[in-house]
Amino acid sequence: MKGNFLPITREEMKGRGWDQVDFVYVSGDAYVDHPSFGHAIITRLLESRGYRVGIIAQPDWRKPESVQVFGEPRLGFLVSAGNMDSMVNHYSVSKKRRKTDAYTPGGEMGKRPDYACVVYGNLIRQTYKKTPIILGGIEASLRRMAHYDYWSDKLKRSVLLDSGADVISYGMGEHSIIELAEALDAGIPVEDITYIAGTVVKAKSLDSIYDAEILPSFEDLKADKMNYARSFYTQYLNTDAFNGKRLVEPYSEHLYVVQNPPATPLTQMEMDDVYSLPYQRTYHPSYEAKGGVPAIKEIKFSLISNRGCFGGCSFCALTFHQGRIVQVRSHESLIEEAKEITKDKDFKGYIHDVGGPTANFRHPSCKKQMEHGVCKTRQCLFPSPCKNLDADHRDYVSLLRKLRDIPKVKKVFIRSGIRFDYLLADKKQEFLRELCEYHVSGQLKVAPEHVAGPVLSLMGKPEHKVYEEFTRQFYKMNEKIGKEQYLVPYLMSSHPGSTLKEAVELAEYCRDLGYMPEQVQDFYPTPSTLSTCMYYTGVDPRTMQKVYVPKSPHEKAMQRALIQYRNPELYDLVIEALHKAGRSDLIGFGPKCLVRPRQVRGSGNDKKAGRKEPKKGSKGSNGQKRQNNSEHRGRVEGKNKKKSIRNVHSKKNRK
């Protein structure tokens, strides 16, 4: 077999001279031995410590024998739904089944179950009644305590209870999984391993649980959503390894779920060690017949520079999963990996990304964090940058220069998100210049998300004027270096706090830019985010103030349609939304109008009214090619033409 992949069959296990593995890793993803995949990191890390690990990727959950490939492991089963929550992987925000799965050979959908951690855990428990089962990965991490589940529209128990598992290793997991392995290897019964940071365990009593904060019981959470809001905020304040408390969630008089404080962040040396493990950097060769695993295309020639994020966006789960303290790899580690990438036969000279959750975070936000942790009730960037913020891109600029100098490297792109408020806080502008000159290919995607103040505040995003200043500096810099490059803003509709009034405000912004996004992301209530808590409870858990929440599919469709008001297929929704918002003044023929009146449709005045009908024989404005693209400037053209996008930001921003 090509390469040194870990065994996926009993025959491969026997071929290594093993009679038994120490751990069996069951994954909802296909086996891809690349450090962008959690199963690759954890299994390689265990291998480096001398443990024997076998992998069962995407077992048939309808057949108990599918998890019996290696027999009973000596120490336990490790279970993960994969790189994504299985429900996000399977369903769009409208709860429609997705057609493809990028983490499955050939992109085939349906190779993992819904709520994969629960299903896999119970499947294993059917056969192996006493074998330890440890859950990990993002699905288990974000469902580790009672949580709102958008897809069933219910409050669910901790996944630890419903899966039949013994322990959850939450967060990134390197520290906790090694401690768990060592404890099991020492013969400690799994029910007695209750003390490891970064784990969640079950307890029958609180006699041996010390220094814990007791959360509302599950019954209390179900009885009153305000209890859930308060409980969630307590959890939110305890996501830091330096000052996080042990939390206890009661389920009955004899059943408690105990969350130990988070594991400590990795040091730079530990980060380097993790990413220097002998990954094959591709999918298992057994998938070749199906065309491989699509997800590899996005990450095969990318470098993971950091983890953790102090951005604090309310709709992002990173605070609960990776934490707010940024951890980074050394230049030497990244350069070594880049050199390995250049040896790949498919490498064309382009490194696709050097980043992580946020590309331009290359050190903790302030000097005190690695000793005292993050501030519990204050954010580093919101509502404005903290006075102690260390906004400095010199290390990142130096790294990017070294990567550009590697032989065979033609260009280094940055595709991870750029936090523009942090960029502006660095007054040197050195990074902005290098970003525009070397690391953008015509377009830079950024995420202002919205323009309305109340919505941005609930999102944890900077005021809109900050984004306006960034656009001004971006275009000024491009003019200075003689380049024509554009910003493409990501926008979100239907976030908590967004009424039709705020949605109209966002539509007017798009009108003033002369820009209609081809895709708009509806807010997606995924487990364990502040925004999801707002969606479920109707309050901001930080203040307990009421928040308007657009929930009906029809209102969400109206909010989305307003942003894409030029799409003829959405005309009726736009008209209805404008009437309901009391903004009928935007229906007409004036330069500020979004659409023309219904009674004169077909009059030939579309352009004047700010509404463009498709010409005869052309297709709607849903991202497909039109016969006359000149009428639709600002859109990415068809695949048979060179991709381009005009400057969607008005010239006033370039002053």
What are these regions (language model features)?
Residues 25, 56, 60-61, 340-488, ...:
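Conserved SAM/AdoMet-binding glycine-rich loop
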Residues 26-29, 290-317, 342, 350:
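N-terminal pre-triad scaffold of radical SAM enzymes
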Residues 85-94, 142-144, 174-179, 204-207, ...:
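Flexible glycine/acidic-rich beta-alpha junction loops that bind and position SAM and/or redox cofactors
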Residues 166, 274, 309, 334, ...:
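Conserved, mostly hydrophobic/aromatic
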Residues 62, 191-240, 254, 263, ...:
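Terminal amphipathic helices with adjacent charged low-complexity linkers/tails
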Residues 38, 57-252, 259:
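Glycine-rich beta-alpha loop elements in corrinoid/cobalamin-binding modules
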Residues 159-171, 272, 561-605:
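Amphipathic alpha-helical packing elements
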Residues 602-655:
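Intrinsically disordered, Lys/Arg-rich low-complexity segments
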